[in-house]
Amino acid sequence: MSEENMKQPEEVVLPPAGSLLLSTSPHVHQGESITTIMLKVLICLMPVVTASICIFGLNAVLVLLYCSAFCLIFEYLWNLLLKQPQTVKDLSAVLTGVILALNLPASAPWWLCLTGSFIAIIIAKQIFGGLGQNPFNPAAVARVALLIGFAGPMTTWIEPMQGFTATEIMTHPTPLGEAQMAAGTEGAATAFEQLESTDGLMQSFLGNIGGSLGETSALAILLGGIGLIVFRLIKWQIPFAIIGTTMLFTWLVHTVDPTLTPGPLFHVCSGGLMLGAFFMATDMVTSPITHRGAFIFGVMIALITCVIRIWGAYPDGVSFAIVIMNALVPLIDRLCYKRPFGWSPVSASALQMRRNEVK
């Protein structure tokens, strides 16, 4: 044998004791943190925030500041009282505050912002264990609660501003409210024709209408939504399913009875559909984990929203639909879970019987 083959193997030197860390999966890290994810979502919200300020002026600034500040305060106080590590720096409370503000009218008083922030942070988030453990979208829960408990302030609109301040209270409903009141009447066709006119749709698309801060400019929301998809922060199946199903369902209803509801473009550009589709229903914590589940989730949100808009008591039902479907996310995940290769009901039953025997 040659000298090389006769050489003894080198001694293996183990690392010092305590230098190796054992941890559970996943071991592959994308490099994203909670703070960076929240920051990216906030950046994507900037077109919507900017549009709301341009449309409603100082009133929008105050509502945004109130909700953001109150959410931060409640987050800080909860962690302080329970002696938990502070989470105010991860920007999740700020994001909740901004989305909540976009669900409120520009005329919302400070106490309404305070109540909504308490519901969003304490009731809908922290009581369930904090970020990552809340089953419902905090902003959607807060909006639903405020609509039920404080319908007056929640439906008091301000006209789009003429200067930097807007103080004129609307004496007529939003486009969705007009459509709901006209539905089924003799003048429904004329009212719907006006709402669906090029000028009417452009007003809704650009934001020159009354309503909540985040439901007036579909263009601004669309720009922010594209940013979310580019950053890969959301599953595109959810907004695609919501918008597509809404257009299909309202087209069918409008075709069957033109006096019951306006056409699909009106429904997409009006109300909180776009905001809910891109920034609320796509919440990572409260949406399904599979692509098929996300699509089903979006379809059901759209159907519930359309049913409430056409036959319900409220002009818009996006937040109601999101909260209802949040409760069904565990069921959707269970039904859409990918079975391992070779799985069958027989093998699963046999395995369960074997497990019971071992116990």
Residue ranges and their predicted role:
Residues 1-72, 79, 356-359:
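N-terminal signal-anchor module of multipass membrane proteins
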Residues 40-48, 63-75, 92-97, 101, ...:
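Alpha-helical transmembrane segments in multi-pass membrane proteins
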Residues 57-70, 107-116, 204, 208-218, ...:
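Structural signature of hydrophobic alpha-helical transmembrane segments
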Residues 73-84, 121-132, 223-232, 278-287:
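C-terminal ends of transmembrane helices
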Residues 92-166:
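A generic, well-ordered mixed alpha/beta core segment in the N-terminal half of proteins
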Residues 133, 138-222:
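Long hydrophobic alpha-helical segments that form multi-pass transmembrane helix bundles
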Residues 135-140, 239, 264-271, 294, ...:
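Loop-to-transmembrane alpha-helix initiation sites
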Residues 239-241, 248-291:
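A beta-strand-loop signature enriched in Asp, Gly, Thr, and Trp
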